[in-house]
A protein has these predicted regions:
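Residues that form or flank phosphate/diphosphate-binding pockets in enzymes
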Residues: 19, 73, 164
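Interdomain hinge/lid region at the active-site interface
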Residues: 126-193
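Glycine-rich beta-alpha junction loops
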Residues: 17, 39-45, 68-69, 96, ...
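Internal alpha-helical scaffold of NAD(P)-dependent oxidoreductase catalytic cores
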Residues: 56-142
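Active-site capping/gating segments
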Residues: 31-71
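Rossmann-like NAD(P)(H) cofactor-binding subdomain of soluble oxidoreductases
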Residues: 2-47
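Catalytic cores of RNA-modifying enzymes
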Residues: 1-2, 52
């Protein structure tokens, strides 16, 4: 049990919110603690002090996910505390946060890492694949350099929503695969339109 000052304001900066908000509500229930989930939508695939960027949060979204432990002044106090970041603050439900970030953040990391792994295996038999991977490939796979431990935690804490995104995308791949197989120019064109 933590010995916390009465009225203390607690937040986090994790990439998933539902599990964190639920844990905070469970662990701090009945205590004089204020909690608000936080997720700065800024970062880099790079790690360590050498990768620090003083302008990292400027104009980036900083998402707050209120809970039953969030008082009316908590949000304003957090905004004031973080005002020097020059971020754009937004408030949403933890569950909606996890759904949206699964599509625009978590799932793209899966795609990038999957494409890197597929290409590495392919290059064993076709060594020029690595040399020919140019700008578009680099743009798509840059985030595959992200820290694996962090991404393991993110995927496991938002697993159901991420699995939905994977299954949806598999369906889209099946559709374009079938269109190519059928030589359906219209369907292929529509895929890219």
């Amino acid at each position: 049990s933590l010995d916390l000052k009465e009225g203390v304001l607690i937040s986090d900066a994790g990439s998933t919110k539902s599990a964190i908000v639920n844990a905070a509500e469970e662990n701090f229930a009945g205590k004089s603690v204020r909690f608000i989930g936080g997720h700065p939508m800024a970062g880099s695939h790079k790690t360590g002090a050498a990768s620090a960027d003083v302008n990292l949060f400027e104009n980036a979204y900083y998402i707050f996910t209120p809970s039953s432990l969030t008082t009316s002044d908590t949000l304003e106090e957090m905004k004031s505390l973080l005002s020097g970041l020059h971020a754009r603050f937004i408030e949403i439900d933890a569950e909606e946060h996890d759904k949206v970030t699964s599509q625009v953040s978590h799932f793209p990391h899966i795609l990038a890492s999957g494409l890197m792994e597929q290409t590495a295996l392919y290059a064993r038999e076709h060594e020029l694949a690595g040399r020919f991977a140019a700008g578009g490939f680099r743009d798509m796979t840059r985030i595959a350099e992200s820290e694996p431990g962090m991404w393991t935690s993110i995927l496991l804490s938002n697993r159901e929503t991420i699995i939905e995104r994977i299954e949806d995308f598999k369906g889209r791949l099946d559709e374009i695969s079938q269109a190519i197989r059928d030589e359906d120019e219209s369907q292929i064109w529509n895929f890219f339109n």
